[in-house]
């Protein structure tokens, strides 16, 4: 090894000499770079990985474009300034620039050749300015542009030829202007456009030629205009379109076969319009549609076979309409639908086979109608339903076979109705049910066989009814019950044997009833109960409550005097307190005193 040293030493000296610059100047320290001078008052940064120069001039209160922007700049931020005018050839030396942000800069005028020299530009932001007009060929010098944002300006029209040269454009946003009409051929120079946003304008109609050249378009947003109707062949060339937004217009009619040719469409939003009727061929040709939103219209009825071609539809929104009835086979052909919303209609009559064919529906919203009585076996064939919403639907009674066939149901919402009677074993086939909500009804009695079959039920809400008593075996089938709310009823007694079968109970509320006494005999250690709420009853603080007094003092976590809570995600609101007072009503000597604050002497004779 030592024999190699004489050879390596001259080589090292030779390399060291070669590294000295001419004239004997010392070498640059590691980390020195040739950063171009940054224009005042901007900030510049050089990406260590790509060596791309970024120039940041945002919100500098500039009235003129900064001078001497380095010619190798790749990105230039000029947003939030006060330019007013963009002169011709303003960026003529920035041929390397690929990103230019001029949004929110008070721009009112852009001269025709303002973007001359920007041959490498990919992204241009001109949104949120005061632009009313752009001359034809304004973007002729930016032929590599991929995205162009012109939204939130004051355009009332767009000149034909404005987009000449933008054959590579993928994204164009003209939303939230004041556009009243568009030239027939305004988009004919954009053969590669993928996303077009025209939302929030004042367009009253669409011409047949308007979208003919946009054969690559995947997303079209026309929401928030004043469109009155959809004619045939408007979208016929958009065979690759996947999402179409027509919501928040004034559409009152759709021509038959209006969506023919749109074989790739997956999402169609027609909500918040004025549609009254749908026809058998309204949605003809939409073979790939997954989501159809028709909520908040004025639809009064649904004809059979209206949706027959939508074999891949997964979500159908029909809420907030005026539908009065559902006839047999209304939803035939919708074998893949998972979510069906019919809430906030005027439904009074649902035929027994109305839901036939909905083999995969998992969530069904029928709330806020006036159904009153559902026919027997109405949900026959809807075997995969997980959640059924029937709250606020004027229902007065539940029949024995109303929910027959719903073997997969997990959640059943029946709150805020007028239910006064439920036939025995009405829930007997709901073996997978986890949550049953019956609060805010008119139940005064629970049959001993009412909950037969609900062996997996975990949550039962019975608050705000008119219950006077509960018989011994009523809750016996509910072996897995976790949460039981019986608050705001008229219960005068609660026998130990009613609660004792509930061996998994964690939460029990009997607040605001008429209980005078309460036995904790069912709470033999080790018990599972974590919270017991008994406030708002007519407690007679005598020997019959000594057990409750001792338990509440021994287990204050189970019977807290209050619980503090804060609205989730909002730290600014004051905390809310839920109190669990055990206020004595009798005898007079203890009236007004909390049971837990009474002395041992009060119960010495027990």
Language model features by range: what are they?
Residues 49, 63, 69-72, 84, 92-97, 108, 116-121, 132, ...:
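Leucine-rich repeat
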Residues 64-68, 88-92, 110-116, 136-140, ...:
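Recurring C-terminal helix/loop segment of individual leucine-rich repeat
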Residues 49-99, 103-106:
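LRR N-terminal entry segment and analogous cap-like coil->beta motifs
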Residues 1-2, 8-40, 44, 48-51, ...:
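Membrane-proximal C-terminal cap and juxtamembrane stalk of leucine-rich repeat ectodomains
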Residues 296, 311, 320, 330, ...:
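Eukaryotic tandem repeat interaction scaffolds
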């Amino acid at each position: 090894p030592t024999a190699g040293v004489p050879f390596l030493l001259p080589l090292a000296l030779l390399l060291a000499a070669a590294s000295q610059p001419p004239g004997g100047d010392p070498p640059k320290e590691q980390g020195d770079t040739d950063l171009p001078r940054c224009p005042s008052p901007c900030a510049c940064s050089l990406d260590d990985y790509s060596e791309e120069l970024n120039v940041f001039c945002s919100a500098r209160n500039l009235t003129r474009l900064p001078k001497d922007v380095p010619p190798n700049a790749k990105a230039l931020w000029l947003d939030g300034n006060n330019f007013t005018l963009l002169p011709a050839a303003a960026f003529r030396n920035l041929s390397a620039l690929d990103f230019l942000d001029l949004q929110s800069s008070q721009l009112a005028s852009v001269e025709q050749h303002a973007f001359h020299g920007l041959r490498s530009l990919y992204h241009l932001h001109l949104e949120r300015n005061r632009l009313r007009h752009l001359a034809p060929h304004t973007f002729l010098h930016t032929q590599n542009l991929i995205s162009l944002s012109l939204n939130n300006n004051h355009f009332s029209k767009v000149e034909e030829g404005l987009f000449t040269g933008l054959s590579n454009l993928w994204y164009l946003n003209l939303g939230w202007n004041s556009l009243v009409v568009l030239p027939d051929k305004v988009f004919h120079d954009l053969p590669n456009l993928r996303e077009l946003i025209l939302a929030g304008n004042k367009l009253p109609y669409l011409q047949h030629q308007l979208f003919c050249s946009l054969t690559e378009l995947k997303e079209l947003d026309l929401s928030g205009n004043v469109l009155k109707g959809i004619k045939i062949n408007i979208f016929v060339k958009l065979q690759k379109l996947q999402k179409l937004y027509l919501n928040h217009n004034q559409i009152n009619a759709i021509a038959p076969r209006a969506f023919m040719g749109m074989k790739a469409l997956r999402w169609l939003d027609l909500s918040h319009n004025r549609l009254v009727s749908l026809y058998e061929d309204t949605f003809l040709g939409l073979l790939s549609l997954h989501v159809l939103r028709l909520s908040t219209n004025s639809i009064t009825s649904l004809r059979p076979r209206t949706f027959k071609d939508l074999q891949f539809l997964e979500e159908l929104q029909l809420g907030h309409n005026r539908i009065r009835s559902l006839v047999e086979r209304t939803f035939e052909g919708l074998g893949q639908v998972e979510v069906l919303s019919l809430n906030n209609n005027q439904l009074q009559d649902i035929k027994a086979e109305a839901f036939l064919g909905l083999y995969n529906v998992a969530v069904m919203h029928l709330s806020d109608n006036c159904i009153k009585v559902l026919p027997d076996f109405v949900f026959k064939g809807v075997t995969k339903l997980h959640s059924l919403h029937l709250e606020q639907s004027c229902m007065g009674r539940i029949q024995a076979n109303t929910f027959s066939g719903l073997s997969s149901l997990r959640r059943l919402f029946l709150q805020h109705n007028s239910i006064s009677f439920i036939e025995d074993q009405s829930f007997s086939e709901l073996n997978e049910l986890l949550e049953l909500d019956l609060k805010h009804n008119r139940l005064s009695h629970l049959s001993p066989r009412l909950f037969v079959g609900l062996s997996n039920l975990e949550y039962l809400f019975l608050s705000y009814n008119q219950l006077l008593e509960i018989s011994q075996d009523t809750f016996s089938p509910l072996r897995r019950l976790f949460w039981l709310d019986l608050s705001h009823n008229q219960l005068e007694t609660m026998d130990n044997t009613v609660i004792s079968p509930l061996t998994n109970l964690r939460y029990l509320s009997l607040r605001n009833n008429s209980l005078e006494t309460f036995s904790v005999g069912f709470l033999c250690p080790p018990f599972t109960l974590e919270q017991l709420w008994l406030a708002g009853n007519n407690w007679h603080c005598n020997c019959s409550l000594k057990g409750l007094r001792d338990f509440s003092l021994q287990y204050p976590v189970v019977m807290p005097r209050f619980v503090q809570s804060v609205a989730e995600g909002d730290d600014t609101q004051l905390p809310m307190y839920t109190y669990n007072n055990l206020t004595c009503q009798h005898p007079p000597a203890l009236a007004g005193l909390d049971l837990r604050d009474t002395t041992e002497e009060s119960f010495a004779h027990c």
